Each structure stands twice: as C-alpha cells, then as structure tokens.
C-alpha cells in the first residue's frame, strides 16, 4: 500500500487548524453561562484561559483541559509526542501537574495501515509517561483526516495558580521556546526544500514538555502565565493584556527564532492562521517603525506546542532563571508589563 505523507491529508497543520479567534469569540458569546459555575469553578472560560480549575471535595482542585489537532510532521511517533506535549502544556501553564489523560483519535482505518495509528498512540503514551501522568483510555472515530490529542486532568493548589488576569506593572516576561513552528509546519506540509530538517526542528521543540515552567509557577507563586499556541505569541499576550487591563511591551529583537524561519517568511510562507491572528489583533497593537515587518509576522505565527510565557515580578527573576537553568530548560527575556493608561496600546512591539 502506498502511504501518503501524514501532513498531506489535512487542510491545515497543528494548532494553525484552530478556528480563527474572531470567529470563535462570536460563537462562544452566544452560549449561556452555567449558574453553578460559582460553586465549583475557580477558573473558567471568561478570560480565554488555557485550562479550567475546578474545586473537588476535601479542599482540593483539579485542572482540566483538552487539545487535539492534525499532523504537524509526517513521522507518526513524533506527531504523537508533539500532540501529547501540546495538550499537557495547558496544565503546566496554570501551575498544575498532569495526573491522568485520555486519548482523542480520528483516523482513516480503512485507508492507512494500523501500525501508523499504533505509532501515533505510542508517541503520545511515552510523552504522558514522561510527564508522570497515567493514560487511562480514550475515544476514537473513523475519519478521513487524521487527528490526535489528549484530554488531560491535573492536580493543582486552588490557592496557587497562574492565569491571564494576573499581570502586574513591572512584570518581566520570559519565553521558554523559540518561535516559528507554524512557518516550519507549513514548509513541511508543502514539501519545501529541506523540509526534513524543519521536521526535526519541530520535533526537537514541539515534543519538549513545559514542565520546568510549571515548576517555576508553583515554587514562586506566579500569578500570570500562558502557553503559546494557535493564536501566536502576539495573540496570547494580547489575551493576557486584556484580561489584566495592562500594556505588554515586547522587545522584538530579543525573540528567539527556530532556524530558517525568517528566510521562509521572507519568501511569503506563512500559515493562514497566522494572517488571521495578525488581522484580529491589529486594532490593539502598536508597532515601532524600526521593527521589521517579517518579525511582526512571526509574532503572530500560529504556534503548535510552543513555550510558556512566564510573567515574573522583578524581585523573583533571578529565582525563576535559577529554576529553569537547574531543569536545563531554555528561556529568553522578551519584554515587560506596564500600567494601562489613556492612549496606551495593549500590545507594543518595539525594537
């Protein structure tokens, strides 16, 4: 049997397949709120949080999330790892620890060999095990388009967690993975020259757990954090700025980029989701005239299994860096938070 490349079987790859933020916002605005939320829900859907935090008996809480997507790479085992790491990331972004997970699978079992699906599931299971969680089952349907991910339950202190609403003036912003996965995934899907190297780079970063960042949140009691996924760095920073009523300033020259990303963007290679992100955010963003427009595109590039944005009070920056170094986790200082004043943009991109 001739097997197509996995990335050729879907319209969009990874988190770039998300519904555009403007469309999603309109749809969700029509849904009523459950009046019981106040009894159980510590953190819900109001501020576009990464996951929900729900009280359970005994004064404890769980953190709940779900994430799945189409292939971002052609290697099935690597795809499983990346998809699982991406789903687990939401728990880490809140300051929780993954506890158990369920598989979510869509697969054309009558068209592709079963061992491809087995490799996807094996990649996911290995990543769940690395996170210290337990895989306890799942659900599958037959579908023309391959999709895989996890529903993850984590444990969390109901009095110590990070959200989009916790930004404070002076907070320093740390980013724990480089940008550009949306661009590289588009190159892989298109079979661009050198796409095999791009796939390796996607695997290197996409399969990396955000566990070290979660440890920083817990040990230092950070109030604000998120992970960078389908709405891009700019989109997720803007969510935090809006939820916290703050202004976020990004030093674009400090942003870490995956290899070849800038060159690929210069050729016009950018996923449709990235264009949608930039358009949706444009009314709340100020771009300094000296900032390269290609870098602005990358700021809004739709990421898959991206790093955490950690908002760290100035007096805790050294401690945060020490924890990340002890975990051998990469990080970059990319900006800071300021008070929101009249005429001040929510998101400022400066050289």
Swiss-Prot record:
Keyword field contains Kinase: yes
Protein name, as recorded: Selenide, water dikinase
Cofactor note: Binds 1 Mg(2+) ion per monomer.
EC number: 2.7.9.3
Cofactor list: Mg(2+)
Native source species: Nitratidesulfovibrio vulgaris (strain ATCC 29579 / DSM 644 / CCUG 34227 / NCIMB 8303 / VKM B-1760 / Hildenborough) (Desulfovibrio vulgaris)
Native organism taxonomy: Bacteria, Pseudomonadati, Thermodesulfobacteriota, Desulfovibrionia, Desulfovibrionales
Catalyzed reaction equations: hydrogenselenide + ATP + H2O = selenophosphate + AMP + phosphate + 2 H(+)
HAMAP family: SelD
Ligand binding (Mg(2+)): 50, 90, 227
Gene Ontology terms for molecular function: ATP binding; magnesium ion binding; selenide, water dikinase activity
UniProt GO cellular component terms: cytoplasm
Residues reported to bind ATP: 18, 47-49, 67, 90, 138-140
Keyword rRNA-binding tagged: no
GO biological process: selenocysteine biosynthetic process
